[in-house]
């Protein structure tokens, strides 16, 4: 790669690093900025990127990508920690949204966490009810749509395989996106069932397979994101009701924190992508203005 273009890659890396550090600083518990510490971090980052000049250009791109992803994950983990500790009220971050789902999702409004007009959930609901709710969702015109289905879908017998399920789910998602193309859709993984729930339906043993299929669908669908609840389901297993199906009031803040952290993660990734694109555009302009050495 020509020297000038190679240096542009390093410059782009510096810009991205500075932006990520600036955003991370805003996550401080008291909102204070330690200028000296921030400057030291930036200086270390610049020194690191300058040292990359001795490396192969193909390796540099991968190293910078890994650094960005690591930093984004650290910021995501810090936000989750702040939400879990109560430093930030998770409910204050639910803005311009709609949440749809089954009886488990009903708890968000039943326990008074979120307003009823933003929680379109019913006991026994499946994604077929979601399809019926599309006009209501469109009327609210939300930026973020949270979908919390799956418990009844797995046991009802309409979709005998995970593949059958996501095939119809994808069609419904496409219907929503056709009318709300700018909305982000966040699909909650299916919370597990626990004993004695399996006495009611052994199909719930297959919940992990259905969730995995939903993840695959999200991975291949633009503006559709999978929210993995496995970690919080394991950590707060004691917050399931005695029926092994529903969850107690105290579980909802943890579930909400997981949902809203994914929204935050997507916003970070979008900001990172925009910064990278801006840096690349600047590189293209410089390349056209000056010949490579």
Predicted regions and their residues:
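Oxyanion-hole/transition-state-stabilizing segment in secreted/luminal serine hydrolases
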Residues: 107, 133-166, 186, 190-197
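N-terminal post-signal-peptidase region of extra-cytosolic proteins
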Residues: 78-86, 124-134
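Acidic/histidine-rich helix-loop elements
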Residues: 112-130, 155-162
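Catalytic His-Asp segment of secreted/periplasmic serine-dependent ester chemistry enzymes
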Residues: 193-293
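N-terminal secretory targeting modules
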Residues: 1-94, 110, 266-293
């Amino acid at each position: 790669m020509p020297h000038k273009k190679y240096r542009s890659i390093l410059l782009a890396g510096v810009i991205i690093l500075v932006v990520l550090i600036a955003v991370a600083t805003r996550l401080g518990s008291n909102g204070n900025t330690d200028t000296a510490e921030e400057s030291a971090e930036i200086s270390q980052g610049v020194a690191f990127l300058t040292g990359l000049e001795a490396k192969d250009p193909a390796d540099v791109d991968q190293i910078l990508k890994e650094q960005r992803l690591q930093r984004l994950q650290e910021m995501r983990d810090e936000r989750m920690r702040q939400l879990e500790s109560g430093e930030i009220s998770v409910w204050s971050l639910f803005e311009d949204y709609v949440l749809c789902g089954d009886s488990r999702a009903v708890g968000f409004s039943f326990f008074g966490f979120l307003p009823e007009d933003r929680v379109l959930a019913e006991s026994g609901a499946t994604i077929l009810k979601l399809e019926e709710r599309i006009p209501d969702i469109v009327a609210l015109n939300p930026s973020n749509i949270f979908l919390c289905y799956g418990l009844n879908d797995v046991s009802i017998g309409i979709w005998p395989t995970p593949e059958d399920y996501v095939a119809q789910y994808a069609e419904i998602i496409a219907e929503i996106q056709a009318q709300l193309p700018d909305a982000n859709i966040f699909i909650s993984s299916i919370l597990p069932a626990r004993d004695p729930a399996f006495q009611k339906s052994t199909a719930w043993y297959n919940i992990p397979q259905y969730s995995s299929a939903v993840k695959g669908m999200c991975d291949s669908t633009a503006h559709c994101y999978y929210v993995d609840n496995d970690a919080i389901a394991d950590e707060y297993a004691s917050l399931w009701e005695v029926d092994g199906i529903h969850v107690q009031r105290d579980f909802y803040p943890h579930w909400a924190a997981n949902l809203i952290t994914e929204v935050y993660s997507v916003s970070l990734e979008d900001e990172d992508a925009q910064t990278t694109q801006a840096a690349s555009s600047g590189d293209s302009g410089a390349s056209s203005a000056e010949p490579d050495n």
